[in-house]
Amino acid sequence: ERISDHSVNLLESAEEMHQKEIHFSKDAQEELQVLEDAVQDTLCRTTDAFRKGDLHLASKVEPLEAVVNELVRAIKARHVARLQAGSCSIEYGFVLDDLLTNYERVCDHCSNVAVAQIEVAQDSFDTHAYLNDLRHGNDTKESEEFHRRLDRYRERYLFPDGQTAEEN
């Protein structure tokens, strides 16, 4: 239900852009396409993992969600740089921020679904501890796999200029 709420918000942002004839720069469009591809990948992996009861697939969602967060931060930073250069407007920034927030929240909910699926299968439900161990665990198999996937997703979702979100 929450994911669909954010989908409606994205639709409303698109309608606002159409009504106000807001068109992002080519660079912003290309950056958003990278983000949208990563969000779509996150949604597909989450729904497939849930539908199939596939814990291995569910474990691939969290590193992808982390990359989406990095992409959102990088797009915001790049927008600020365009604002400072005078090649973008504040009004565009409000719409962009709405889009980014909703994409990020969709992926947050996907992460919640995948982590809950894993935790229930392990007869546990300490999500914060699980995520902390995953991201900062010392030489655990799960943590190592998380970081391998994180690096792979960073390479997959490069900006058109060849930079990863982490490099921004």
Report the location of each language-model feature.
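Cytosolic, long alpha-helical scaffolding segments
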Residues: E1-N168
